[in-house]
Each structure stands twice: as C-alpha cells, then as structure tokens.
Curated annotation (Swiss-Prot):
Annotated Mg(2+) binding sites: 45, 74
The protein's name in its UniProt record: dITP/XTP pyrophosphatase
Catalytic residues, chain numbering: 74 (proton acceptor)
Pfam families: Ham1p_like
C-alpha cells in the first residue's frame, strides 16, 4: 500500500461546493489540501460510465500533473422512479447552452421527470446521493471509498445552504433537507465521535478510517 507521506494532498475538483466540504472534512487531520484549480489544472473529460471510473479519471490526472497524491469525488443523485437517473450524469442535467451549470434548472428537470412517471407519494420519490472518493497516486495506483445517503425528493426546493440538488433532498430520519442544514449538520459527524450523514462524509469517513487512523466509531 502506498503511504501518505507529509500532509499535502490535491483535491481534484473545480467545484466550489465540493472544495468547501473537503476542506471541512480534512481540516481536523491537519492536511494542506489544495485544489486542482489552485494548481491551474484543467478539468479532464469525465468519460466514465460509473462513479468509480470518473473519480479515477479526475484523481489520476491531478496526481500525475502535480506529483502528489490526489483525492477526487464523483457523486450524483440516483432516483429510484427514474431508474437511477440522473446518476453519473447528475451534473450534466444542470448544463446550460453556454456551458455553465444551473442547478435550479436541474432540480426542476428532475421534478418534471418525476411527475411524468407519476411519482407523487414519498414512497415513489425515494432515492439516494452516492459519492465515490478516489485516492490516486502518480504511478496510477488507486483506492476507492463509497458512501450513500438515502432519502426522498421533495418539491418545492427548501433551503439555501449546501449546493447542487441539496434543497430537494430530504435524508431519511430528518425533517430538514440538505439545503436547510449547516455544514456540520449535513456532514453529521466529528472524527471519532459520531456516524456520518451525507454521502460525501460517509465516503470520507471510510477513507479516514483506512488512511488517517480514524477509530471506527459509528461507522456507516
């Protein structure tokens, strides 16, 4: 197994929301996490058909370009009534003609799709957020950590916190959407103290248990 020498790691993302979450999650472990954008790296084309493949594409590109280990995350919303869509194409559903991303439009598109298949009840609107974290090294070696958060899609959107599809995702057992939760509420844990809540925090918790000597307390 490759070692994480030193405290430098590249977060292979240009997504401001993801970068904030990684900074929150890695802060307690003393890592200096710089983004691919900090290094002036371009965004590679995500040509994979699974979360794992896309996470690897991003992490490997950053690791090779910087000579440092790199962490990437590929994530998406998988809705049961839509046969798992948007899935790995979650970000694509937000793309506009000028190449920017409009997640208000993406949430509306998801709601229209649910209405078209007659998904009206909470039971018919179940889904999950999935996140796969890839730790890649310059020589191509890689490890994967997967986290999922089960919940229900609500409409209209609720809350202005978080990012992406957070305002329409109500995690099981809670009365707040991810869009109504603070970062601490959404992550749902502190190292060694509690179980993670969000998909990204659950994936990161597995990474931390494997790589950062985090005790397996409340593991998901």
């Amino acid at each position: 197994m490759h070692t994480l020498d030193g405290k430098k790691i590249v977060v292979a993302s240009h997504n401001a929301g993801k970068l904030r979450e990684f900074a929150d999650l890695m802060g307690p472990f003393g890592f200096e996490a710089k983004s691919a954008k900090d290094y002036g790296l371009p965004e590679p084309d995500e040509t994979g058909t699974t979360f794992e493949e896309n996470a690897y594409i991003k992490a490997l590109a950053a690791a090779k370009a910087t000579g440092l280990p790199a962490l990437s995350d590929d994530s998406g919303l998988c809705v049961d009534a839509l046969d798992g869509a948007p899935g790995v194409y979650t970000a694509n559903w937000a793309e506009t003609p000028d190449g920017s991303r409009d997640f208000a439009m993406a949430m509306q598109r998801t709601e229209v799709a649910l209405q078209e298949v007659g998904a009206a009840s909470a039971e018919q609107r179940k889904g999950r957020f999935v996140a796969v974290i890839c730790l890649a090294f310059p020589d191509g070696a890689a490890e994967y950590y997967r986290g999922e958060a089960e919940g229900t899609l609500v409409w209209p959107p609720r809350g202005e916190l978080g990012f992406g599809y957070d305002p329409v995702f109500l995690p099981n057992g809670f009365d707040k959407t991810f869009g109504e939760m603070s970062a601490e509420e959404k992550h749902g844990w502190k190292p060694g103290q509690a179980a993670a809540l969000s998909h990204r925090a659950r994936a990161f918790q597995k990474f931390a248990q494997a790589r950062l000597d985090l005790p397996r307390l409340g593991s998901a």
